[in-house]
Amino acid sequence: MKIRPIGDRILIKFKEREEVTKSGIVLPDTVKEKPQIAEVIEVGPGGIVDGEKVEMVVKKGDKVIVSKYAGTEIKIDGEEYTIIRQDDVLAIIED
Amino acid sequence: MKIRPIGDRILIKFKEREEVTKSGIVLPDTVKEKPQIAEVIEVGPGGIVDGEKVEMVVKKGDKVIVSKYAGTEIKIDGEEYTIIRQDDVLAIIED
Amino acid sequence: MKIRPIGDRILIKFKEREEVTKSGIVLPDTVKEKPQIAEVIEVGPGGIVDGEKVEMVVKKGDKVIVSKYAGTEIKIDGEEYTIIRQDDVLAIIED
Amino acid sequence: MKIRPIGDRILIKFKEREEVTKSGIVLPDTVKEKPQIAEVIEVGPGGIVDGEKVEMVVKKGDKVIVSKYAGTEIKIDGEEYTIIRQDDVLAIIED
Amino acid sequence: MKIRPIGDRILIKFKEREEVTKSGIVLPDTVKEKPQIAEVIEVGPGGIVDGEKVEMVVKKGDKVIVSKYAGTEIKIDGEEYTIIRQDDVLAIIED
Amino acid sequence: MKIRPIGDRILIKFKEREEVTKSGIVLPDTVKEKPQIAEVIEVGPGGIVDGEKVEMVVKKGDKVIVSKYAGTEIKIDGEEYTIIRQDDVLAIIED
Amino acid sequence: MKIRPIGDRILIKFKEREEVTKSGIVLPDTVKEKPQIAEVIEVGPGGIVDGEKVEMVVKKGDKVIVSKYAGTEIKIDGEEYTIIRQDDVLAIIED
């Protein structure tokens, strides 16, 4: 089974707090309850979104910082995922 | 009798919770009361919507994840359906 | 006497609840007080509306599902009508 | 003395309730206090309004149904008039 | 000393209530406290305003009906003036 | 040290009330607490702002009337300045 | 490890209050709790943002005045950073 995001949407999986800490990035106290770092699992094709051409710059496997609590959560085969728009991605983390 | 959605609208039928669980996708507790997975029954022609060209990417028979509680519910011959805009579709589920 | 809607507006007449039920479509309880199915009586010419070209896709005589309680009601020769924008039409019902 | 509306604005004069009733159109109770049918007295030239080209479709002398309580009232030589935008006109009444 | 309005702005001087009455136009009671008729003193050059080309249609010396209480008041050499956008002008009064 | 405003922003210095009065312009009582007349100290390059081409019409040294209390205040070497957008300038005062 | 901002976003580091004061710029009391002067650490590529072409004018190492409390804070290797959009930068400080 595969989730194919539509338009500029991407499917991400938030990283556990321990993993985040290990990678050297710690999120401030105010966001302690929900990690803001995620791995990109699937990427939509982009194209015309709201009448504007959107080019996808994130790729499968990227580690990203996500801006907001927004997004729709789904559970697939027991794992939690979130679908967000690419514009909710603030930055890509390169190792 | 047939429902022909206008513009970028689509007619969907939400899947029963049991069917959703069987397919390996479970929705989080917060949305327990209303399943977010639906089957596409009819698709509008797209075209110019709000002055922007909208191309339809969902097709009849697609299984889709729907973003919001929005949409207009109607009952046809005893069955419940919902009319939403294509932009309310987050992703297509492929088996 | 004739009502000629301007731009993308259409003149509709809501169908009585009994007629709606007979046609096999029943609206959910939450909208019991006002039927959402209407017949199209007159259609505006479309053209440039809010700076965007609008093409009319509904026709005189169409049976339509209407999205909202919006619209302006008027009474002509004792009959109640409503003027809405075409974008308030969700779908056309074909027999 | 003459009032020359600017852009897509028009000068209208609301019809007395008696005149409205005589013409076969009765407005619902909720708008009893202010008639919604008016005669067009002067029409602006249209042109670029809010960056969009607006073509005037109402003409001097048209009887029109007006959508809202909006508009600016003025009294000229003892008579009450209202200035509205053309987009506040819902339909033209033809005899 | 001269005030040069920027873009689509104009400098106006509201007319005293007595002058307004003399000219045959009386404003309704609800606006009794502030006359809505003004003389145009200076006119901005128009040009690109908010990304849209605005052509100035009011001229120095025009008598205008102004739509709103908006605008910024200033006092120059003891006289009160107001700066508004051209779009706040509803109509030009011709004698 | 120099402040270089970005885009359509300008750095201004509000004039003391005494200077304003001397120049023949008095602001109404409602704005007594903060003078609305300012001198332009630095001007941004304009260019594409919010996707629209903005041409700068105010110049260093201009005396301007400013529309709002908005803007960001900063203190440089003990002097107070404000950064506003050019669109917050209503008019230029010429002597 | 490197943070690569997306689109028109930039990664900044706010300067300590002491550094700000030393440089001759003092922020007013109302913003005492959070300095508004920052150093630019990383700059996104710009490109199409919200359907508009954005050209980046700030560069790595620039000292900038930032307009708002907005932005997302992250901690990298024990240091606090903030991700903002370029439009939140009011001006560049040149020494």
From Swiss-Prot, chains A, B, C, D, E, F, G:
It comes from the Bacteria. Keywords: Chaperone, Cytoplasm. One of its GO terms (cellular component) is cytoplasm. The keyword Chloroplast does not apply. InterPro entries: Chaperonin_GroES, Chaperonin_GroES_sf, Chaprnonin_Cpn10_CS, GroES-like_sf. It is found in: Cytoplasm. Its main location: cytoplasm. The keyword DNA repair does not apply. Gene3D superfamilies: GroES chaperonin. One of its GO terms (molecular function) is protein folding chaperone. GO terms for biological process: chaperone cofactor-dependent protein refolding. NCBIfam families: PRK00364.2-2 (NF001531), PRK00364.2-4 (NF001533). Together with the chaperonin GroEL, plays an essential role in assisting protein folding. The GroEL-GroES system forms a nano-cage that allows encapsulation of the non-native substrate proteins and provides a physical environment optimized to promote and accelerate protein folding. GroES binds to the apical surface of the GroEL ring, thereby capping the opening of the GroEL channel. PANTHER family: 10 KDA HEAT SHOCK PROTEIN (PTHR10772), CO-CHAPERONIN GROES (PTHR10772:SF58). Belongs to the GroES chaperonin family. Heptamer of 7 subunits arranged in a ring. Interacts with the chaperonin GroEL. This is Co-chaperonin GroES.
